[in-house]
């Protein structure tokens, strides 16, 4: 019985290749798009669709900024699909106007995974392995624990799945301590080949999505805030390159020397900038470093890391 499986598979593959050849001859434009999607290449000039945020824009949570990025990218990246573990409104991951996926509507791009984070993670892995799609899945950061085995397998297999984990701090509203992630962020950073990015504001969030979509050798986790954060003037021209490097000098010391380095991620970056101003009043020169991704920073050349964090500046504070 087993010996017949090989020839059956060969016949099925030959039939599929004949159908593909016929399709390519009949639908040339669609066939080129199919080849692109199956190869994992992103559409040309897709980066131009990334939104840019201004410092005078009203403060917004990075989960809201992420939703705006998805709204901008969905029309230009047709293979971008995803959903949430029954938390799409809260995680801002619903693609408006693109319908829901079901057996009757396979063209829908929104997936309702249900309250089953581990199942969602496993489904994302299967979608990525099958090919032709770029899936993301969302839940609260605290619930990443429920999908950890699926995340670890994605990292082991080098699958470029994207996780959107929101409500990343104690500012989680009325839900209380059961929804406050404490140890989750550090434990996720320990998973080999999982790129964790915790952006400081809207522009860093857009840059984080760029990194996630261009990363092909493993999963990426976007860790986002529930509470509103200011749109920092310092990130407008620096975020795209800075986030890709994992850490960068966001604001140099206003004095002619650096007495201390303040290192922060996510919602604490704005606090670091305020601390820099207070220290300046005391004639203490503070450099502020935004470090959204430890693993990406670790991959940088030594000269870059030493430029951001010089060894002779021994006073450092991580917030």
What is each of the regions a protein language model found here?
Residues 76-80, 105-109, 130-134, 156-162, ...:
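Short coil/turn connectors at secondary-structure junctions
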Residues 63-72, 122, 146-151, 206-210, ...:
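Short alpha-helical segments and helix-capping/turn motifs at coil-helix boundaries
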Residues 6, 20, 24-27, 70-81, ...:
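Structural signal for hydrophobic packing residues in well-ordered secondary-structure cores
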Residues 83-84, 113, 136-137, 163-165, ...:
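General beta-strand structural signal in soluble alpha/beta enzymes
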Residues 1-116, 259-261, 265-267, 278, ...:
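Conserved acidic/glycine
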Residues 1, 88-186, 204-207, 214-319:
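Thiamine diphosphate
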């Amino acid at each position: 019985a087993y010996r017949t499986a090989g020839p059956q598979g060969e016949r099925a593959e030959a039939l599929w290749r004949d159908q593909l050849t016929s399709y390519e001859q009949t639908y040339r434009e669609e066939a080129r798009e199919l080849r692109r999607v199956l190869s994992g290449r992103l559409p040309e000039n897709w980066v131009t669709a990334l939104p840019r945020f201004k410092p005078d824009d009203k403060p917004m949570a990075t989960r809201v900024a992420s939703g705006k990025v998805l709204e901008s990218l969905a029309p230009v990246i047709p293979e971008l699909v995803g959903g949430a573990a029954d938390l799409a409104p809260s995680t801002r991951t619903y693609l408006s106007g693109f319908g829901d996926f079901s057996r009757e509507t396979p063209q829908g791009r929104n997936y309702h995974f249900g309250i089953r984070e581990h199942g969602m993670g496993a489904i994302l892995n299967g979608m990525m392995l099958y090919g032709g799609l770029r899936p993301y899945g969302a839940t609260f950061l605290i619930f990443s624990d429920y999908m950890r085995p699926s995340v670890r397998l994605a990292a082991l297999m080098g699958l470029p799945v994207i996780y959107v984990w929101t409500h990343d701090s104690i500012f989680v509203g009325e839900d209380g301590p059961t929804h406050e992630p404490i140890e989750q962020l550090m434990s996720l950073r320990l998973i080999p080949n999982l790129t964790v990015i915790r952006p400081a504001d809207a522009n860093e969030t857009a840059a984080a999505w760029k990194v996630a979509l261009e990363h092909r050798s493993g999963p990426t986790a976007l860790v986002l805030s529930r509470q509103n954060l200011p749109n920092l003037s310092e990130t407008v021209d620096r975020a795209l390159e800075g986030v890709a490097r994992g850490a960068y000098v966001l604001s140099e010391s206003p004095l002619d020397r650096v007495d201390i380095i303040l290192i922060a991620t996510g919602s604490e970056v704005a606090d670091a900038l305020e601390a820099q101003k207070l220290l300046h009043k005391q004639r203490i020169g503070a450099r502020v470093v935004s470090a959204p991704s430890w693993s990406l920073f670790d991959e940088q050349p030594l000269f870059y890391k030493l430029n951001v964090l010089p060894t002779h500046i021994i006073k450092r504070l991580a917030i």
